[in-house]
Regions:
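N-proximal low-complexity "stem/linker" segments adjacent to membrane-targeting elements
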Residues: 1-21
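Short beta-strand/loop segment that forms part of the nucleotide-sugar
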Residues: 29-37, 56-58
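Active-site-proximal specificity loops/subdomain of glycosyltransferases
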Residues: 43-92, 100-101
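Short, acidic, metal-binding catalytic loop of nucleotide-sugar glycosyltransferases
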Residues: 21-30
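Short acidic donor-binding/metal-coordinating loop in glycosyltransferase active sites
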Residues: 36, 94-98, 103
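Catalytic-site signature of metal-activated, phosphate-bearing donor transferases
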Residues: 67-72, 101-227
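Short acidic/polar active-site loop segments enriched in Thr and Asp
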Residues: 29-30, 88, 120
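Ser/Thr-glycine-rich phosphate-binding loops at phosphate-binding pockets of nucleotides
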Residues: 7, 34-44
Length: 227
């Protein structure tokens, strides 16, 4: 496979279909998913697709780094999934995170096919989205579409997620990963050396402005990864 999404979820059937459809439109080949003891009807959603690989966790709760034996890319469920199911590139994210292609490219896949030789990891900043201006307004019912409802962008969050070339990984993490070779932001100008001893927070606060600047509202989800 060329491009896969890797994620764990728990009781997120309300968003799974929109999330999977979004990434399929971005050129994703397969989804490597782990169910963390969900009690909702997620299976009826996943049954609609033929490119889902599902691991069901048998423990009380997934524990980072201890739940599964050490694999090729480190400890934990993500290493297990990526060791057993081959893919060239992986987007490791949560079901409330929607990543979009950079301006000038139709899909994330197209961007990786054309520019992927320039880096081994793309570190993408998070932006939180809300359904109305202000962060303290509660929403009473689950909207039909997260992307169409949460349209007001807040300031860029310090956290990031990554698109990573799997064969370059030396240690998997939650946000960005230790890799051999070049790690960069989506502008392809900022370089970082991320090793197993590097603290994540050192890189989480670096400012980056999306091409065209910030907008008061934009398509997004509960979280949107802006390029």
């Amino acid at each position: 496979m060329f491009l896969s999404v890797v994620a764990c979820f728990k009781n997120e059937s309300h968003i799974l279909e929109e999330w999977i459809d979004h990434y399929q439109k971005q050129g994703v080949d397969q989804f490597l998913l782990c169910d963390n003891n969900s009690t909702d009807d997620y299976q009826s959603i996943l049954d609609k697709y033929d490119n889902i690989i599902l691991h069901k966790d048998s423990s009380a709760q997934i524990q980072w780094g201890t739940e599964f034996p050490r694999g090729k890319y480190g400890d934990g469920i993500y290493s297990k999934l990526l060791t057993e199911h081959k893919t060239e590139w992986a987007i490791i994210c949560d079901p409330d995170e929607f990543m979009y292609a950079r301006e000038g490219y139709d899909t994330i896949r197209q961007f990786l096919e054309e520019r992927g030789s320039e880096f081994n990891q793309l570190i993408v900043p998070n932006i939180l989205f809300h359904h109305k201006p202000g962060t303290d307004i509660e929403i009473k019912e689950q909207p039909e579409s997260v992307v169409d409802t949460f349209i007001y962008a807040s300031r860029m969050d310090k956290n990031v997620k990554s698109i990573v070339k799997v064969d370059s990984i030396t240690k998997l993490r939650v946000h960005e990963h230790a890799v051999e070779g070049r790690s960069t932001r989506p502008n392809l100008k900022d370089d970082f050396v991320l090793t197993e001893g590097t603290a994540n927070s050192k890189y989480g606060c670096l400012p980056i402005v999306p091409k065209g600047g910030y907008k008061g509202s934009a398509p997004g989800g509960a979280k949107g990864n802006m390029w």
